[in-house]
Amino acid sequence: MCDAFVGTWKLVSSENFDDYMKEVGVGFATRKVAGMAKPNMIISVNGDVITIRSESTFKNTEISFKLGQEFDEVTADDRKVKSIITLDGGVLVQVQKWDGKSTTIKRKREDDKLVVECVMKGVTSTRVYERA
């Protein structure tokens, strides 16, 4: 199921993340601090519950969920969103909705990397992780 995602991943490259955060509505100061952070992502599976934990000097966040079931999430920039995550062709697809807005976050394996693509309206950010 999601075994290919399990493990500890470290951020190695980030493209367009500031523009993405700006489109989401993240304030200037938070964008600057978050943009400099180099988070580790720890993904684990326990039965049918998947946990994604992000650890950085900026903030630690954790979500635990079952595929296809909506859940409440407080994001690293303190947005309160409704999220749903599905597995589509080997890609974890997360949709966050809040205040009439939505953003899509896709997590996929490419070779030995984990690629995270964040899309809000016409702005796309790509963040690449390698095993830690």
Curated annotation (Swiss-Prot):
<feature type="modified residue" description="Phosphoserine">
    <location>
        <position position="13"/>
    </location>
</feature>
<dbReference type="GO" id="GO:0042750">
    <property type="term" value="P:hibernation"/>
</dbReference>
<dbReference type="GO" id="GO:0005634">
    <property type="term" value="C:nucleus"/>
</dbReference>
<dbReference type="InterPro" id="IPR031259">
    <property type="entry name" value="ILBP"/>
</dbReference>
<keyword id="KW-0446">Lipid-binding</keyword>
<dbReference type="GO" id="GO:0071285">
    <property type="term" value="P:cellular response to lithium ion"/>
</dbReference>
<keyword id="KW-0597">Phosphoprotein</keyword>
<keyword id="KW-0813">Transport</keyword>
<dbReference type="GO" id="GO:0009617">
    <property type="term" value="P:response to bacterium"/>
</dbReference>
<keyword id="KW-0539">Nucleus</keyword>
<dbReference type="GO" id="GO:0050873">
    <property type="term" value="P:brown fat cell differentiation"/>
</dbReference>
<keyword id="KW-0963">Cytoplasm</keyword>
<keyword id="KW-0007">Acetylation</keyword>
<dbReference type="GO" id="GO:0042632">
    <property type="term" value="P:cholesterol homeostasis"/>
</dbReference>
<dbReference type="Pfam" id="PF00061">
    <property type="entry name" value="Lipocalin"/>
</dbReference>
<dbReference type="InterPro" id="IPR000566">
    <property type="entry name" value="Lipocln_cytosolic_FA-bd_dom"/>
</dbReference>
<dbReference type="InterPro" id="IPR000463">
    <property type="entry name" value="Fatty_acid-bd"/>
</dbReference>
<dbReference type="InterPro" id="IPR012674">
    <property type="entry name" value="Calycin"/>
</dbReference>
<comment type="function">
    <text>Lipid transport protein in adipocytes. Binds both long chain fatty acids and retinoic acid. Delivers long-chain fatty acids and retinoic acid to their cognate receptors in the nucleus. FABPs are important elements related to the hibernating state in mammals.</text>
</comment>
<comment type="similarity">
    <text>Belongs to the calycin superfamily. Fatty-acid binding protein (FABP) family.</text>
</comment>
<dbReference type="GO" id="GO:0045892">
    <property type="term" value="P:negative regulation of DNA-templated transcription"/>
</dbReference>
<dbReference type="GO" id="GO:0036041">
    <property type="term" value="F:long-chain fatty acid binding"/>
</dbReference>
<dbReference type="GO" id="GO:0005324">
    <property type="term" value="F:long-chain fatty acid transmembrane transporter activity"/>
</dbReference>
<protein>
    <recommendedName>
        <fullName>Fatty acid-binding protein, adipocyte</fullName>
    </recommendedName>
</protein>
<comment type="subunit">
    <text>Monomer. Homodimer. Interacts with PPARG.</text>
</comment>
<dbReference type="GO" id="GO:0005737">
    <property type="term" value="C:cytoplasm"/>
</dbReference>
<dbReference type="GO" id="GO:0015909">
    <property type="term" value="P:long-chain fatty acid transport"/>
</dbReference>
<dbReference type="GO" id="GO:0050872">
    <property type="term" value="P:white fat cell differentiation"/>
</dbReference>
<keyword id="KW-0909">Hibernation</keyword>
<feature type="short sequence motif" description="Nuclear localization signal">
    <location>
        <begin position="22"/>
        <end position="32"/>
    </location>
</feature>
<feature type="binding site">
    <location>
        <begin position="127"/>
        <end position="129"/>
    </location>
    <ligand>
        <name>a fatty acid</name>
    </ligand>
</feature>
<feature type="modified residue" description="Phosphotyrosine; by Tyr-kinases">
    <location>
        <position position="20"/>
    </location>
</feature>
<dbReference type="GO" id="GO:0051427">
    <property type="term" value="F:hormone receptor binding"/>
</dbReference>
<feature type="modified residue" description="N-acetylcysteine">
    <location>
        <position position="2"/>
    </location>
</feature>
<dbReference type="GO" id="GO:0120162">
    <property type="term" value="P:positive regulation of cold-induced thermogenesis"/>
</dbReference>
<dbReference type="GO" id="GO:0071356">
    <property type="term" value="P:cellular response to tumor necrosis factor"/>
</dbReference>
<dbReference type="GO" id="GO:0050729">
    <property type="term" value="P:positive regulation of inflammatory response"/>
</dbReference>
